[in-house]
Amino acid sequence: MSENAANNIMETKICTDAIVSELQKKKVHLFYCLECEELARNIAAESDHITLQSINWRSFADGFPNLFINNAHDIRGQHVAFLASFSSPAVIFEQISVIYLLPRLFVASFTLVLPFFPTGSFERMEEEGDVATAFTMARIVSNIPISRGGPTSVVIYDIHALQERFYFADQVLPLFETGIPLLTKRLQQLPETEKVIVAFPDDGAWKRFHKLLDHYPTVVCTKVREGDKRIVRLKEGNPAGCHVVIVDDLVQSGGTLIECQKVLAAHGAVKVSAYVTHGVFPKSSWERFTHKKNGLEEAFAYFWITDSCPQTVKAIGNKAPFEVLSLAGSIADALQI
């Protein structure tokens, strides 16, 4: 057999395998909450096997939800998913009402995509009487009814504390994904002249992410108590002469990131950037980081977040130094598992 003939056979096999793989993908009907409409459309744009479906989100005069799932008969025997955003207690009840019903509509399988698990930072009971709402939320999600295909799959990105994966009961199948591949892809697009190293603002962030970023040199910061204050200090590593990227799972007020940036700059970092999967930013605290004359002008070269918190993405727009790295492609892939 000639070399050209062998190459043609190999190319034909590769094409055939690709076609078979594409045909084996399941068709998914994706419902979504109002906040997540843009992300849902981006997910559908990633795959021809994802079809968007709609829900009528209305309220009665007393404020309680008046909901209707369109095409309820058409999704029987189909793979169904729901894209949720538990951005506030006010919207959780209406979404849970839909989430509990969809698996009961005789669907082949049901997947809940909850990019941000909102109560994840409230997982500890430091004294008797503390309420660990992370466990409460996990119990609510764990009680989703099974579908004809079995337990519900729950897709969550970068849950705050690693032990929270054990909060979910056996009635659901949690799939814990991460946004770190989006960061590494973006870092590869930076100029080759920049020496990039990764900084973790505390030991918790190091535990969560260091294995995913072990091909980068690292710096670890820590918080130490001085009187009534908690001061950020450099624990290990040398940021001098480098573009340092602070990595964490979420940001609220941003105080820790700002203090960490000051410490890194004081130790000789040429640039400081930040990445968090979940830009929560309550009370518009993201404004502290925008490039303007407020004492923090361009303190951060880049601030990367994902679109796991749609309200934040909408508020920030394209304001520097923020860049949004979309989870759409990753979610589309997760829906095929």
Curated annotation (Swiss-Prot):
The keyword Kinase applies. The modification N-acetylserine is found at S2. Keywords: Acetylation, ATP-binding, Kinase, Magnesium, Metal-binding, Nucleotide biosynthesis, Nucleotide-binding, Transferase. Pfam families: Pribosyltran (PF00156), Pribosyltran_N (PF13793). InterPro entries: Pribosyltran_N, PRibTrfase_dom, PRTase-like, Rib-P_diPkinase. Gene3D superfamilies: 3.40.50.2020. This is Ribose-phosphate pyrophosphokinase 4. The lineage of its organism: Eukaryota, Viridiplantae, Streptophyta, Embryophyta, Tracheophyta.
